[in-house]
Regions:
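Short, Lys/Arg- and Gly-enriched loop/turn segments at beta-strand edges
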Residues: 278-290
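Beta-sheet entry/capping signal
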Residues: 121, 131, 269-274, 309
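Short, structured beta-strand/loop micro-motifs enriched in basic residues and often containing a Trp
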Residues: 246-256
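Composition- and surface-driven signal marking solvent-exposed, interaction-prone regions
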Residues: 135-139, 287-292
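Short Pro-Gly-centered flexible turn/kink motifs
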Residues: 262-281
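Short, glycine-/Ser/Thr-/acidic-enriched flexible segments
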Residues: 232, 277, 317
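Polysaccharide-binding surfaces and accessory modules of carbohydrate-active proteins
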Residues: 1-241, 258
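An acidic-aromatic substrate-binding cleft motif
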Residues: 271, 290-326
Length: 326
């Protein structure tokens, strides 16, 4: 069974398999083409959520420390989907469960009317009888970010990374897959290396090395995928390859990268860090335009917006902390 979502120039395609598993096959401003899927495992690896609990075996074919074939993420079963509208736009809630542990997982997708951006987060609930140790949970997971177009990933894809630091703010750079260690070294259908393109932060200075943002440009299709992680603490995103395709996963803190760990007691719930993801035709300018509209939409109402006071920011010490009213 296929579920097609078309909203605000975004196209999403879910599949419910014969094994009662739900897959996210597509998220893009471009239309879905079945022939673009080129995986040795078919659609099996297109999981919408990855969640890793302590002490569980991960039997799938994977390499390195990347967050693929997580357990119980790989065995989650589809339970229900809610599709409704609220004050901001369309809302999807995809409910999954792992009966052996009693873990219930809800993937939340919030659309915003007229904006090609979603907000995504994951909610966990322990319906079992034992404590569960959470080491990782994705806020957004998408396999197949490379699938549109006929050229190789080396030829068509660019990753845009935003370095940021004290006195070195907002340094955006473009990289090819080869420059980041992800050049093609295996036949397309079986790519699953141990290499990752990983960017993150540990601690409450969330932008001390990088901005919690990124973009993936497909030069062949002239489309761009972009994202931000909405977190003032630890966060992490990674791009890598799995079963013939490349994936993007966004999250808050993790056990491996930032020594984060959550003990989920019976009856407890936990919500992951929210992230926003969008897609557009064009390049960074179009991505920035959609993201700016989204940021304006989510900003809470406050007195500053009404009174609009003039605030001087001594950015880059232009007046060395000694401004005047003149």
């Amino acid at each position: 069974k296929r579920i097609e979502i078309k909203e605000n120039n975004l196209n999403m395609v879910y599949e419910i398999t014969d094994e009662n598993e739900i897959k996210l096959l597509h998220f893009s401003n471009l239309p879905f083409d079945e022939n673009d899927i080129n995986s040795c495992e078919g659609t099996a690896s297109f999981r919408p959520v990855e969640v890793l609990l302590s002490g569980l075996n991960r039997p799938g074919e994977r390499h390195g420390t990347k967050y693929t074939y997580t357990a119980p993420g790989y065995r989650l079963k589809y339970k229900d989907m809610k599709d409704y509208r609220n004050e901001t736009g369309r809302k999807l809630e995809i409910l999954m469960e792992d009966k052996p542990t009693g873990l219930e997982v809800c993937s939340n997708i919030q659309f915003y009317d007229g904006i090609s951006v979603i907000r995504s987060w994951t909610e966990l609930k322990n319906n079992g009888e034992e404590d569960l140790g959470v080491e990782y949970v994705s806020s957004f997971a998408l396999l197949g970010i490379d699938k549109e177009g006929l050229l190789s990933t080396d030829e068509k894809l660019e990753v845009l990374i935003a370095r940021n630091a004290w006195q070195k703010e907002l340094i955006w750079n473009r990289f090819s897959m080869d420059q980041l260690g992800m050049s093609i070294s295996q036949p397309d259908k079986v790519r699953r290396s141990s290499q990752t393109i990983s960017v993150g932060n540990t601690g409450n200075w969330s932008t001390k090395n990088y901005l919690p943002m990124g973009c993936l440009k497909n030069k062949e299709t002239d489309s761009i995928l972009f994202w931000q992680i909405e977190q003032n603490g630890s966060w992490y995103w990674e791009i890598s390859d799995q079963d013939g395709h490349m994936y993007l996963q966004l999250s808050g803190p993790t056990e491996h990268q930032s020594h984060w760990w959550k003990n989920l007691k019976p009856g407890d719930t936990f919500a992951s860090v929210p992230v926003s993801v969008g897609s557009a035709c064009g390049d960074v300018e179009e991505a920035a335009g959609e993201l700016t509209k989204y940021r304006r939409a989510i900003r809470r109402k406050n007195e500053d917006n009404e009174k609009l006071p003039v605030i001087f920011n001594d950015y880059m010490n232009c007046l060395w902390g000694d401004p005047t009213t003149e």
